[in-house]
């Protein structure tokens, strides 16, 4: 399970329901859950069997999604406002259109032990964290991706992110480095060193 706490206010429709009301509707052993995410006003859970659950905290409605092509445990998941679900498993990364029930395998794989957070920016571009080693940028419209690898001495760890729109994406690493991502050039630069990452990578 993620090392995070998701605290959601219970809706008025659940006011008189027992504390285990939602758990019983999910009908799954909590020990099987592998990840959690709160997106599009729903709590999303992934489990070891490749199943995904959406829970409405306002009324307790639970939906279960079984995607036939996904058999592995869900490592991470993200759901966008447009109804696209992004999933990582040990077999790869996927985009799932909930409305059309259409699954697309993305052109990269992240090992389960390195699968970090998934998030999207102001321009609906998707970002995948690959452990402390890299960030993968994915453009859903153009179906393109780019991997930004970090030198070993400058791992990203639990970074902080600020989306500045046209100015770019700013990342602050635990080591105090400020990184700027240029969406037009698909380049990332260290602000406090003013040189691209490729200068530090081994030949």
Where do the PLM segments sit?
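Carboxylate-rich, polar loop motifs that coordinate divalent cations or form catalytic acidic clusters
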Residues: 1-203
